[in-house]
């Protein structure tokens, strides 16, 4: 079942911000055009940055489009919101995208309710569509107990991967956002992590001393996905056996649908890789993005038989995509994965202890 629309604030600025955020969230959740959605996220930043006097002046003059970053669509949302109305764009987004993401079985719904957190998400520091604070607020609103921010590592330049210096700077941002969340009375625990590239030789694409300071590390292959199995298998085994690896991300790299087209799964000795995951207590990610559905069903069964832990993650690149966990929960329920073997059902304290146990 879908949740009822949230009550909108009555204060004009708070109402405008809530409406802009909800339009963005619902379109992100439905994986609509990112460029169009970014306009609403940018408008949030603009409206939030206005002084009280500036906000009052633009409200009275209806001069929202004079502001850089406010276009006709976002101006209409703000105008209707400050007038106390439900904006037309918001009503349409609720109608079109506010329903259930998928039809879930009772077992799937039960497992979704057991998920405490999410260990794979991205912000605008790399290739995400929103700043960390917006991601954290959305995760809190969805009832998550914790969220790990795991922006990309430097090798992945196309995704604006973080250099060592930028990763250190992000640590300060995480601390600031943690304080902001506390000041807002939110209970979400924010974890600082990384999605670190597995390089061709199986090493991890970041300084080991920095990786060791993080709460969690998702190791993923993003390059040379068509590498022969004889080369891909030792590459993945080296990453899994590295004590810094917590989660093996989207292990086949496949794409089954979506705007980026399709991509076949990488070839590797799955029995050997999953045996190593089980031995090293590295979780196999069950990536919830519908275009990935990674691992495939037959590999989930193989990892389950091998005794692996799992991590159901959204791989969200925008706040609304944090809701994609439902797809992962249903796949895990269909596969019969016991909840206790899914690390994202564990409390944050247990997750951090597990991720640090091999350091």
Residue ranges of model-derived segments:
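Charged catalytic cores and adjacent phosphate/nucleic-acid-binding surfaces used
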Residues: 2-12, 76, 87-115, 132-137, ...
């Amino acid at each position: 079942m879908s949740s009822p629309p949230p009550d909108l604030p009555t204060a004009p600025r708070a109402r405008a911000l809530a409406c802009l955020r909800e339009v963005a969230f619902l379109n992100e959740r439905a994986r609509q055009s990112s460029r169009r959605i970014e306009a609403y996220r940018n408008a949030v930043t603009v409206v939030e940055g206005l002084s009280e006097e500036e906000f009052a002046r633009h409200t009275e003059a209806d001069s929202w489009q004079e502001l850089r970053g406010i276009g006709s669509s976002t101006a209409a949302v703000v105008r209707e919101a400050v007038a106390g109305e439900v904006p037309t764009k918001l009503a349409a987004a609720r109608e079109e995208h506010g329903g259930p993401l998928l039809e879930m079985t009772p077992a799937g719904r039960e497992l979704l309710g057991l998920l405490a957190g999410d260990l794979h998400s991205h912000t605008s520091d790399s290739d995400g569509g929103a700043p960390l604070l917006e991601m954290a607020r959305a995760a809190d609103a969805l009832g998550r107990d914790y969220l790990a921010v795991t922006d990309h590592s430097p090798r992945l330049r196309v995704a604006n991967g973080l250099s060592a210096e930028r990763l250190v700077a992000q640590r300060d941002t995480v601390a600031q956002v943690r304080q902001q969340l506390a000041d807002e009375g939110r209970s979400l625990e924010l974890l600082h992590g990384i999605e670190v590239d597995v390089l061709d030789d199986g090493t991890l694409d970041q300084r080991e001393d920095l990786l060791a300071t993080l709460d969690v590390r998702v190791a993923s292959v993003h390059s040379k996905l068509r590498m022969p199995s004889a080369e891909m298998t030792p590459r993945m085994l080296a990453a899994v056996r590295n004590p810094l690896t917590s989660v093996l991300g989207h292990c086949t790299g496949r794409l089954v649908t979506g705007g980026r087209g399709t991509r076949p799964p990488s070839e590797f000795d799955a029995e050997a890789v999953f045996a190593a995951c089980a031995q090293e207590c590295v979780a196999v990610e069950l990536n919830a993005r519908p275009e990935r559905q990674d691992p495939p069903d037959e590999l989930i069964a193989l990892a389950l038989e091998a005794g692996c832990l799992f991590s159901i993650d959204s791989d969200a690149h925008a706040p609304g995509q944090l809701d994609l966990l439902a797809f992962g929960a249903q796949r895990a329920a269909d596969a019969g994965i016991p909840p206790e073997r899914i690390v994202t059902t564990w409390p944050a304290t247990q997750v951090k202890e597990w991720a640090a146990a091999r350091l």
